[in-house]
Amino acid sequence: VAVTGKRGCLAVLGTALLLAALLAIAAVVAWRHYLHFADTPVPASAPSVVIAPGDSLKATLRKLRAAGLVQGAELEWQLLARQVDAAGKLKVGEYALSPALSPRELLTRMRQGRVIQYRFTIVEGWNFRQLRAALATATPLQHSINALDDAALMARLGFAKQHPEGRFLPETYVYQRGDSDIDVLKRAHAAMDKALAQAWEQRAPNLPLVSPEQALILASIIEKETALASERPLIAGVFLRRLQLGMKLQTDPTVIYGIGSSYDGNIRRRDLTTDTPYNTYTRTGLTPTPIAMPGREALLAAVRPAPGEALYFVAVGDGTGAPAFSATLAEHNAAGARYLQRRRLPSTPQTETTP
């Protein structure tokens, strides 16, 4: 009987060891399967997925399934979320579903809030009409200002009495899904305020400018006159010397701005003599408002002009975009004649009333 009992115990022990071995093998296989799931890139049929406020891991997983990411059981996703400390910590936003992204990397990004970043660029020299048109087509921004006129828009921003022209700094602004056009404009407005204040603090002494607002106006004119950074301080010097002497600025971009949306790409002699608040051929001093969005270099040029004696400048016409600067009207007319000769047009000497 004792032998039989001993054999029975050995049989039970053997069975237990076999079961333990099988369970261990199964555990190893399951773990390897889990690791393969967690660390193998999986393609999706959609480019992105959006986690909305209140979405749980289960809700997010349903969205991933709908986006074509079908690998892995729900239990594996739950285990992985705990392993990467993402359980209950997924951040709201839009996430890219890259073919090279593994589930582990995806959940880590969702925990860290590494959402898709979009970019909107305000181009130097744009006017506010152009800015609004570009902003209206930016996706996936939420659009809330399309029905507002400029005055109502500025009131919405908190600047009810401020003209919008020139008030938004040309830069590239990063945003994400869920942001609005108002969010972008607020940031661009704050950036311009800061850039203008910094430029004004660096202003040269004895400028004929009494406020940062005047510097902004002049910077916008400089911005429209040239795209060459090296020429901006020189052009600023011409305009500032003319202001000091009480001379009219006589610059075409201000006339074009005054013409408005009816401008057809050509500026005619009658345009130079038709008075508008922005016609610097008929009016002395700066324009009532900026005429464009000046960049940082134009802002700095307006308050730190290059030294010199030039009171005039005209296009050289050599394809570089660089102007010729002159200290006297005679020199200026000669430079203008050379420019017109390059264009094979008849030269008309200018008078003291034209730059």
Where in this protein do the model-derived segments appear?
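Generic detector of intrinsically disordered, low-complexity, polar/charged segments
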Residues: A2-G5, A11, A24, I51, ...
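N-terminal type II signal-anchor transmembrane helix
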Residues: A2-S45
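Intrinsically disordered/low-complexity terminal segments and short unstructured peptides
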Residues: V3, G14, A59, Q350-T353
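A broad, low-specificity signal for short, low-complexity segments enriched in glycine/proline
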Residues: G8-V12, G54-A59, L79-Q83, V92-E94, ...
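Compositionally biased amphipathic helical and low-complexity segments enriched in hydrophobic
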Residues: A11-G14, L18-L19, R62, A330, ...
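Short low-complexity stretches enriched in small and charged residues
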Residues: T15-L19, A86-K89, W126-R129, A236, ...
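Signal peptide-directed extracytoplasmic domains
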Residues: W31-A199
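Bacterial extracytoplasmic/cell-wall-associated proteins, especially those involved in peptidoglycan
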Residues: S56, A133-Q142, M154-P355
